[in-house]
């Protein structure tokens, strides 16, 4: 899919203003084009639509909250102003940069996803990277992480990887995107001393909130998003905000806990977009440090899959991501029947001056 195309036209980059919509009504052509570009790549890599993101999910990623600031940059062949809502201005978009700036921790970091419209062109990458560095400079950010999905053999064959290396980026975490036919999921056998607890959204039952906050902090410590991620304190206010934010979307969250006498021993969750209910996206899976070595990583996934099948009869497949260096979890996924589809890569650039 990715063939480098040389452009002879100048590229113009502008901020989509504002980068979010207060409601989901009438998203602009720029917002829709960015979403279509993201999905086109994932469809090509996976051979289907199960890893795609609905427009509603796209809008949710652009909304600000207390944990992050979001910016969307549009690269086009024509110069002009672009809005997020009620704007059909066509500037001949060639690519977009979705930027996220953490506000509570890692405040020297910026995260970016570059989406290319139709063919990938080095000039578009160069323009988006320059604009990204400008946004970082304004916020005194010095480390950039770019997330990019590639084919299973893409590290050797994808020209975008070569371009990132040439720009000084270093390869970081590589995750494997996998998929499971839910019909193949086996029912769990839960041993004595453990009981499953289920909840929707972000708010667990009151008696488990303290334990839930601790296991989220522990997951951040043990499975950091980047190689230099700082510990993050989770609070009740944070999950209340996330719960309210999720309630505004068409997305539902299914959560499964395994609870013992000391609290939460294992946790996993999955998101279900009702615009595309056939594919369910499994998110975090985490086992408390005190409960490891008992097979709970596999068990909590089976517990979650049963909950998904019970609550969402239209669900047919599970999709998920796991780091390639997490051999234990990859082995669990293989036993469960998940099959690899593509890679999600993270690239790091430290900017001096």
Place the predicted regions along the sequence by residue.
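Active-site/acyl-donor-binding loops of N-acyltransferases
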Residues: 164-185, 306-353
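A conserved short alpha-helix in the GNAT/GCN5 acetyltransferase fold that borders
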Residues: 129-138, 292, 301-309
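Short amphipathic alpha-helix that is part of the acyltransferase structural core
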Residues: 2-68, 75, 190-237
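Acyl-donor-binding surface of acyltransferase catalytic domains
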Residues: 1-12, 118-207, 344-349
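Glycine-rich phosphate-binding loop
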Residues: 123, 295-299
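Polar/charged side chains located within well-ordered beta-strands of beta-rich proteins
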Residues: 34-38, 42, 58, 146, ...
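A mid-sequence, solvent-exposed acidic-amphipathic segment
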Residues: 236-267
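Conserved donor-binding loop and adjoining core beta-sheet/short helix segment
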Residues: 17-21, 39-153, 260, 264-288
């Amino acid at each position: 899919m990715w063939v480098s195309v040389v452009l002879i036209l100048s590229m113009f980059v502008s901020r989509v203003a504002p980068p979010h919509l207060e409601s989901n009504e009438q998203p602009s052509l720029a917002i829709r084009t960015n979403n279509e570009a993201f999905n086109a790549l994932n469809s090509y890599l996976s051979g289907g639509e199960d890893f795609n993101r609905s427009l509603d999910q796209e809008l949710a990623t652009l909304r600000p909250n207390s944990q992050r600031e979001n910016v969307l940059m549009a690269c086009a062949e024509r110069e002009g102003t672009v809005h997020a809502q009620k704007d059909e201005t066509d500037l001949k978009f060639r690519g977009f940069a979705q930027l996220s700036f953490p506000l509570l921790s890692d405040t020297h970091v910026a995260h970016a996803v570059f989406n290319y419209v139709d063919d990938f062109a080095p000039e578009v990458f160069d323009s988006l990277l320059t604009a990204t560095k400008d946004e970082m400079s304004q916020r005194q950010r010095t480390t950039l992480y770019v997330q990019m999905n590639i084919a299973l053999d893409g590290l050797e064959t994808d020209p975008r990887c070569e371009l990132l290396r040439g720009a000084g980026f270093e390869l970081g975490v590589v995750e494997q995107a996998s998929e499971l036919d839910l019909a193949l999921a086996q029912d769990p056998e839960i041993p004595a001393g453990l009981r499953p607890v289920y909840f929707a959204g972000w708010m667990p039952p009151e008696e488990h909130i303290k334990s839930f906050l601790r296991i989220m902090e522990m997951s951040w410590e043990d499975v950091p998003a980047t190689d230099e991620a700082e510990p993050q304190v989770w609070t009740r206010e944070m999950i209340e905000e996330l719960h309210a934010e999720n309630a505004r979307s068409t997305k539902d969250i299914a959560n499964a806990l395994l609870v013992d006498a000391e609290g939460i021993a294992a946790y996993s969750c999955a998101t279900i977009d009702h615009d595309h209910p056939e594919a369910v996206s499994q998110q975090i899976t985490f086992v408390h440090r005190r409960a490891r070595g008992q097979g709970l990583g596999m068990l909590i996934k089976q517990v979650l899959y049963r909950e998904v099948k019970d609550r969402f009869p239209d669900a047919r497949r599970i999709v998920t991501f796991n780091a390639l260096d997490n051999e234990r979890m990859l082995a669990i996924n293989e036993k469960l029947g998940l099959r690899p589809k593509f890679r999600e890569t993270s690239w790091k650039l430290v900017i001096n001056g």
